[in-house]
């Protein structure tokens, strides 16, 4: 599926399914008998806040949580259904977790991400033993000298980097007809909900891994839909930050005007936590200066349980026809939003907006060629 076409035709359905919690179960999700329990820690749908509570109480440690995720990756990403969402594991993840546990025992907790495992897309530089290849065999052997700026911010916040996720090669700019979730280095990533269906891209690995609970949180990158499309397909919360809120330094580029990394998580609250942790002014990326005085380190303060009250939400009428199961789920989601105070407005096909897709992608191609 072309992710731009998906954005036009599929994202509202994804929002609806997520809103009512009725998305089909991912491989190993609650109620599934597909995976064998190997740990007392239930990672399915667990939040940052819940993990922090377990570490604070001493029930778990960053090391035990990290090991639990690594075992889950072994069971369903590298075996079983072989989701193939992770292109490389970090050999230093346990030692990182040990250091963060030591800090906690000494009374230092950096913040809500202290000791929390994370996966990042393989076009984001990490100054460690892992490669940064954008999924391409052409870059095999490429080790970054230092972290991307946003990776530095996240490490400073206390994350445990589990590894790197697969992607549509070169962030889906390998060709004008590339395949979502496939790279020459990593192979084809699968959707954890329906193994033979498209996981969308280009942040396919982050979407699949997040949906399968292979990490507490994930990071993707987006030029034109590469965070929000796989997030929607995989029932995640994806945010494309305003360009400049997160630095682009150290991320393999496509467009100087549209590229950015962004959060991909299981919940809105976790996305807000991750969004704040990644912000910061970077001297090497002048556009981040635009965020001075406009950004914050804690976006959770803007979360409101009654946030839909008084809001008008438009839904194209075309989404209310077709597959009866999907239509039923979407209408149920519409009802939930209405009970939360939103007004649902059914609108005709927004043809003028859809016409923007072609010139936009041409502009991205121009950006890519001009560097």
How does the language model describe each region?
Residues 1-14:
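N-terminal secretory signal peptides and thylakoid transit peptides that target proteins
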Residues 16-19, 33-224, 242, 335, ...:
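Gly/Ser-rich catalytic/binding loops embedded in alpha/beta enzyme cores
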Residues 28-29, 34, 240-333, 351-354:
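A short helix-breaking turn/cap at a secondary-structure junction
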Residues 114-134, 297-316, 365-371:
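Short helix-loop capping/hinge segments that flank enzyme active sites or metal/cofactor-binding pockets
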Residues 133, 176, 180-183, 356-371:
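Charged, often glycine-rich, active-site loop that binds/positions anionic groups
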Residues 228-233:
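Structural signature of FAD isoalloxazine-binding scaffolds in flavoprotein oxidoreductases
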């Amino acid at each position: 599926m072309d992710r731009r076409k998906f954005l036009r035709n599929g994202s509202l359905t994804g929002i609806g399914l997520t809103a009512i919690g009725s998305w089909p179960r991912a491989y190993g999700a609650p109620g599934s008998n597909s995976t064998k329990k190997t740990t007392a820690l239930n990672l399915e749908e667990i939040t940052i806040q819940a993990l922090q509570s377990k570490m604070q109480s001493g029930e778990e440690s960053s090391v035990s949580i990290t090991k639990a995720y690594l075992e889950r990756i072994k069971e369903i990403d590298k075996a079983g259904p072989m989701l193939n969402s992770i292109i490389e594991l970090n050999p230093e993840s346990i030692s990182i977790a040990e250091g963060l546990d030591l800090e906690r025992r000494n009374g230092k907790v950096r913040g809500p991400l202290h000791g929390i495992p994370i996966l990042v897309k393989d076009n984001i530089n990490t100054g460690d033993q892992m490669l940064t290849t954008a999924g391409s065999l052409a870059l095999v052997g490429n080790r970054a000298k230092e972290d991307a700026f946003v990776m530095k911010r996240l490490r400073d916040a206390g994350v445990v980097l589990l590894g790197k996720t697969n992607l549509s090669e070169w962030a889906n700019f390998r060709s004008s007809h590339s395949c979502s979730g496939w790279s020459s280095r990593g192979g084809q990533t699968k959707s954890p909900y329906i193994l033979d269906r498209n996981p969308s891209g280009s942040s396919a690995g982050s979407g699949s891994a997040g949906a399968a609970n292979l990490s507490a949180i994930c990071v993707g990158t987006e030029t034109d839909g590469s965070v929000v499309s796989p997030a929607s397909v995989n029932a995640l919360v994806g945010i494309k930050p305003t360009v400049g809120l997160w630095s682009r330094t150290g991320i393999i580029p496509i467009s100087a005007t549209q590229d950015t990394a962004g959060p991909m998580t299981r919940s809105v609250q976790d996305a807000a936590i991750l969004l704040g942790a990644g912000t910061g002014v970077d001297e090497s990326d002048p556009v981040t200066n635009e965020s001075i005085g406009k950004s914050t380190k804690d976006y959770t303060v803007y979360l409101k349980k009654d946030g839909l009250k008084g809001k008008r939400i438009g839904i194209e009428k075309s989404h209310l026809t077709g597959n009866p199961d999907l239509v039923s789920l979407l209408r149920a989601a519409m009802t939930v939003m209405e009970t939360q105070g939103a007004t649902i407005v059914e609108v005709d096909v927004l043809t003028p907006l859809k016409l923007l897709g072609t010139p936009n992608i041409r502009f991205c191609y121009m950006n890519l060629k001009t560097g």
